[in-house]
Amino acid sequence: MTGTPGAVATRDGEAPERSPPCSPSYDLTGKVMLLGDTGVGKTCFLIQFKDGAFLSGTFIATVGIDFRNKVVTVDGVRVKLQIWDTAGQERFRSVTHAYYRDAQALLLLYDITNKSSFDNIRAWLTEIHEYAQRDVVIMLLGNKADMSSERVIRSEDGETLAREYGVPFLETSAKTGMNVELAFLAIAKELKYRAGHQADEPSFQIRDYVESQKKRSSCCSFM
């Protein structure tokens, strides 16, 4: 016996009822790219956020492009973050450029124990301004903050550079999870606000939000 696709079979000649379509498990989608020199911890950063785990041991560089999805809820809105992990090596840079145009947000990482990765941030920002959307969300992240004994880049240096380019700044640790979730939640809140805020909804500034959360975290650490 054949029937209408998507219909529910009934008895006694009753008209079949269509099954309700499956509702998506998210309300909006945002494409986020992780950028920065090879070895700054982009892959570990992504896995810490996605799975709450840290990849220790042998370092394996990302080849080309990889991505993972995760849905986060901000202010009652489910935001699906499609997070692209990019290779930092120069030979893959042309591949990375092709993905800039569709990105709504970019997380730019450097390693606080590696001066060259910090010095190269300006070059990365030049590429971003050349290839990415004009209104793309950018956040600067000083990763490997758990390795304080090997630090060569002061937190103040990261703050100063971020202010120069008008972007929010966080120090993070893919190993301990420090500020990893905050970085993605801040991005999700910004994307949600841009997608269509209500007239009576207060304006959202991602830099102000990040700063307020940093101060809140600092206060809690002394309690």
Curated annotation (Swiss-Prot):
Q: Which residues bind GTP?
A: 38-44, 62, 88, 143-144, 146-147, 173-175
Q: Which cysteines are joined by disulfide bonds?
A: none
Q: Which reactions fall under this protein's catalytic activity?
A: GTP + H2O = GDP + phosphate + H(+)
Instruction: Output this protein's name.
Output: Ras-related protein Rab-37
Taxon lineage: Eukaryota, Metazoa, Chordata, Craniata, Vertebrata
PANTHER family linked to this entry: PTHR47978
What is any Pfam family matched here? Ras
The entry's function note states: The small GTPases Rab are key regulators of intracellular membrane trafficking, from the formation of transport vesicles to their fusion with membranes. Rabs cycle between an inactive GDP-bound form and an active GTP-bound form that is able to recruit to membranes different sets of downstream effectors directly responsible for vesicle formation, movement, tethering and fusion. Acts as an organizer for autophagosome biogenesis in a GTP-dependent manner. Involved in retinal homeostasis by autophagy regulation.
Q: Which source organism?
A: Homo sapiens
* Motif stretch (Switch 1): 52-67
* First-listed, main subcellular location of the protein, grouped into a coarse class: cytoplasm
The record's keywords, sorted A to Z, are: Acetylation, Cell projection, Cytoplasmic vesicle, GTP-binding, Hydrolase, Lipoprotein, Magnesium, Metal-binding, Methylation, Nucleotide-binding, Prenylation, Protein transport, Transport
Entry-linked InterPro entries: P-loop_NTPase (IPR027417), Small_GTP-bd (IPR005225), Small_GTPase (IPR001806)
Any domain commentary?
Answer: Switch 1, switch 2 and the interswitch regions are characteristic of Rab GTPases and mediate the interactions with Rab downstream effectors. The switch regions undergo conformational changes upon nucleotide binding which drive interaction with specific sets of effector proteins, with most effectors only binding to GTP-bound Rab.
Q: What is its EC number?
A: 3.6.5.2
Q: How is its activity regulated?
A: Regulated by guanine nucleotide exchange factors (GEFs) including RPGR which promote the exchange of bound GDP for free GTP. Regulated by GTPase activating proteins (GAPs) which increase the GTP hydrolysis activity. Inhibited by GDP dissociation inhibitors (GDIs).
